[in-house]
Amino acid sequence: MAEHLASIFGTEKDRVNCPFYFKIGACRHGDRCSRLHNKPSVSPTLLLSNMYLRPDMITPGIDAQGNPIDPEKIQADFEDFYEDIFEELSKYGEIESLHVCDNFADHMIGNVYVQFREEDQAARALQALTGRYYSGRPIIVEFSPVSDFREATCRQYEENSCNRGGYCNFMHVKEIGRDLRKRLFGHLHRSRRSHSHGRSRSPSPYHYRRDYDRRSSSRSRDHDDYYRGGSHDYYRGGSRRSSERHRSSYDSDGSRRRHRSRTRSPVRDGSEERRAQIEQWNREREAAQV
C-alpha cells in the first residue's frame, strides 16, 4: 500500500495531493483546491508570483490604449526585465535556470521561477526579497516544489501546437534571445567546465559584470544606481543595456522608481468569461482522460 501511494504521489491518480501544485507550484483553484498543496519548507527553487507585467497583458498584441504593439518591442521589453531580474537574483547565489511564464491565467501570468544551485542560496534570496517591492508592486516570493522543469512545461507549446493558448495550466516559458542567454549563462558554463578539468575555479559567475557600491553615507547617487532594499543600499548597474534602457527598482518602502519612460502596464483584473473558458477546457481535459 505504501509503495502504491508513493508511486502515484503528485500524479492525476493521487486524490489527496494536488498534481498541478506538485509539478508547477501553482494551481488554478488556489486555496479552494480540494487536494493538498504541500508547500516545501526549503527548496532550491523560488516562485515570484505575477512579477512580469507584459505591455499587452490585457489583450495580446494590443496596448492599454488599443494600439497594436510591435512584437519586437514586446520582446525587447521582456529581455530588459529578464536581464534585470537575473542580475538581482544572481546576487544571492548561482542560478541554474530562470523561467518566466507567458501564460494568461490568473495563477500563472508573469510567474518567475528561479532555480539556484544550492538550497541555502535560494533561502538567502527568499529572505532578502521578502517585504520588498518591484516597480511599486510587492514581491510575492515563496519556495516552490518544482524540481524538474521538463515536467512543468507544456510540450505542445514548445512544438507550437498547444490548443489552449495562454490559458494552459502548464508553463509556457517565454524565451530570451540567444545573445542574451549566452551573455547571462555563458560565463556560468565556462566556469563549470574549468572547474571540472581540475583548474582553479573562476570567481563566482553571479559577480561577473557588476561593481557594488556599498556606500550608505550619501543619498546622492549616479543615475545608474537604481536598486534599493535588501542587504545592499543600492545596486550599481554595469551593463550598458541595463543601465541605459531599464530603470526598474527593488524598493523596500513601496515607492516607485520607474524604468525608462514607458507607461506602466495596467493591473489585469480577473474575468468571469475567461475563468469560464478555463473551466470548460479543464472539463474537456478531464472527460478525455476518463
UniProtKB/Swiss-Prot annotation:
GO cellular component, one term: U2AF complex
Protein name: Splicing factor U2af small subunit A
Extent of Basic residues compositional bias: 188-200, 256-265
GO-annotated biological processes: mRNA splicing, via spliceosome
Subcellular location: Nucleus
Main localization, broad class: nucleus
Domain named RRM: residues: 44-146
Stretches the record annotates as Disordered: 188-290
Keywords annotated in UniProt: DNA-binding, Metal-binding, mRNA processing, mRNA splicing, Nucleus, Repeat, RNA-binding, Zinc, Zinc-finger
Role: Necessary for the splicing of pre-mRNA.
Residue stretches of biased makeup (Basic and acidic residues): 208-255, 266-290
Source organism per UniProt: Oryza sativa subsp. japonica (Rice)
Recorded GO MF terms: DNA binding; pre-mRNA 3'-splice site binding; zinc ion binding
Pfam families: RRM_1, zf-CCCH
Coiled-coil segments on the chain, per record: none
